[in-house]
């Protein structure tokens, strides 16, 4: 009889993967909102709908279903009226006010992390409003400290056919990469108007970009040539994807690049964030220890022994004792300071009255005898 086959060991249950946060940035008019709309629809069709957050307080209509909308919390026009601000100042202030409650947004994302694989964040149209503001830094670091975070820089391909404009986009991309220090994907949008192959060639082939620049003879072209010598090493290795938010092409390749960027985050960026978090915690702990030690030294320099003042002539009283005995002490001090405390005032007055009375009687008798 054959021996029974031992049941295979159950596979270890895999821990749920945290969602990947996609931070969509780009200059005004590059098609960020349309890109988020198309990417949301693409992920819905793939059976993994994303968790969408809108951070643009000035947009009139959002063409995608937003789970969290900044307009529900902050009224953009009311902020402009109350603080007397212009459009950009209103956006910055609205974003600052929203950033003060971003811990609640993080709680919502944590609750939904087992349901959603992607978190899409659509940022304001003005790129500098989010990238170079304190609120943008707070939001980016809050996301990156808890979830795999990837920056998607949406670039208008049709406006980058000029080498100078292309270099301006690359300068923006490198500045965001330097500021966020997160995995980075350059999304060349509007490929339905013009193919993005020329831009990819300029990014990866320095000589091809120099040949295109040689056709320009302006001062700006010379500046662009100098900048390309410095920045070529940075943007030549960036991930590049060409998409069309209108037609919907290129999003499968984008999802592949997002997966690769999330793996890079877990491999390189998360250990760095953990190290920074640990060093910050150690610095705070050391600061607290120094404050406690300083407080202990300050307390040690003060005499806390109640027996230490026994030998002094004037005893030390509590504030309550001083309040209750103030009148008594003042009277005692006045009596102690008097120079006539050793004289009996009653005896002195009687001794003065007797000779005065005798003098008065003698004068009266003498006056009576004269008149007689």
Swiss-Prot record:
UniProt entry keywords in alphabetical sequence:
Acetylation, Cytoplasm, GTP-binding, Hydrolase, Nucleotide-binding, Nucleus, Phosphoprotein
Q: Which Gene3D superfamilies match?
A: P-loop containing nucleotide triphosphate hydrolases
For the region Disordered, give the residue spans. Answer: 303-372
Q: According to the UniProt entry, what is the EC number of this protein? A: 3.6.5.-
Please list the residue ranges that the record marks as compositionally biased, kind Acidic residues.
330-342
Report the SUPFAM superfamilies cross-referenced here: P-loop containing nucleoside triphosphate hydrolases
Any one Pfam family here would be: ATP_bind_1
Where found, per UniProt?
Answer: Cytoplasm; Nucleus
Q: Known InterPro entries for this protein? A: AAA+_ATPase, Gpn, Gpn1/Npa3/XAB1, P-loop_NTPase
The annotated regions of Basic and acidic residues compositional bias extend over 343-355
Molecular function via GO: ATP hydrolysis activity; GTP binding; GTPase activity
Q: How does it assemble?
A: Heterodimer with GPN3. Binds to RNA polymerase II (RNAPII). Interacts directly with RNAPII subunits RPB4 and RPB7 and the CTD of RPB1. Interacts with XPA.
- Name-wise, this protein is GPN-loop GTPase 1
Protein's organism: Mus musculus (Mouse)
């Amino acid at each position: 009889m054959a021996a029974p086959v031992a049941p295979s060991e159950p596979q270890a249950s895999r821990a749920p993967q945290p969602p990947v946060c996609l931070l969509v940035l780009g200059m005004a008019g590059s098609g960020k909102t349309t890109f988020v709309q198309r990417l949301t629809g693409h992920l819905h069709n793939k059976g993994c709908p994303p968790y969408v957050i809108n951070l643009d307080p000035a947009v009139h209509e959002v063409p995608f279903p937003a789970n969290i909308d900044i307009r529900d919390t902050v009224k953009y026009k009311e902020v402009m009226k109350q603080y007397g601000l212009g459009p950009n100042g209103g956006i910055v202030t609205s974003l600052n006010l929203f950033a003060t409650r971003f811990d609640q947004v993080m709680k919502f994302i944590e609750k939904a992390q087992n349901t959603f694989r992607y978190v899409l964040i659509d940022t304001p149209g003005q790129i500098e409003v989010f990238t170079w503001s304190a609120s943008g830094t707070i939001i980016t670091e809050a996301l990156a400290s808890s979830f795999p975070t990837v920056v998607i820089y949406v670039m208008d391909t049709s406006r980058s056919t000029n080498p100078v404009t292309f270099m301006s986009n690359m300068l923006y991309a490198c500045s965001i990469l330097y500021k966020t220090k997160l995995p980075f994907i350059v999304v060349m949008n509007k490929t339905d108007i013009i193919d993005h192959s020329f831009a990819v060639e300029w990014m990866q082939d320095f000589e091809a970009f120099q040949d295109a620049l040689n056709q320009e003879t302006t001062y700006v072209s010379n500046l662009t040539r100098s900048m390309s010598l410095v920045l070529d090493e940075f943007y030549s290795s960036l991930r590049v994807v060409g998409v069309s938010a209108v037609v919907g092409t290129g999003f499968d390749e984008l999802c592949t690049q997002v997966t690769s960027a999330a793996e890079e985050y877990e491999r390189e960026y998360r250990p760095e964030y953990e190290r920074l978090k640990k060093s910050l915690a150690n610095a705070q702990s050391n600061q607290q220890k120094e404050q406690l030690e300083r407080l202990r030294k300050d307390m040690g320099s003060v005499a806390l022994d109640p027996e230490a003042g026994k030998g002094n002539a004037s005893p030390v009283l509590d504030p309550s004792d001083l309040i209750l005995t103030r009148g008594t002490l003042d009277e005692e001090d006045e009596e102690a300071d008097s120079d006539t405390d050793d004289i009996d005032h009653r005896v002195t007055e009687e001794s003065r009255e007797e000779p005065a009375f005798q003098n008065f009687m003698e004068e009266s008798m003498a006056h009576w005898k004269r008149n007689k």
